[in-house]
Amino acid sequence: MQKYNLPLWRVRALIAAGWEIDAHTITHPDLTAVDDAQLWREVHGSRVALRRMLHVPVEFFCYPSGRYNAHVIDAVRRAGYLGATTTNYGLARPARPYELSRIRINGSDGVVGFEHKLESVAP
């Protein structure tokens, strides 16, 4: 494991506290630039590894660096994920479960910054 990864006991503590754990590949490649075999290892293999280690459902995927295309979406769908998040800013739309937008919150945002981000996407 890389030095910035959480120890397994901390991940289990997050799960016990109600956090959901989802997949993000094994080696963080640009999935639009890898061959089919590596694409499958990254997408399916990360799900299998997390389920094996943590004994929890792994139902969503996050595209590394936000890079994806129709071929990558197809692999994510075939691997059994219910949806995937992108780096696109905005509210998630249920009509596009494999292209879910999100609002990135940083530690430096503070309460006012958090409120501003929510207001910027409010319907």
Q: How would you name each of these model-derived features?
A:
Residues 1, 11, 16, 20, ...:
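C-terminal active-site subregion of NodB/CE4 polysaccharide deacetylases
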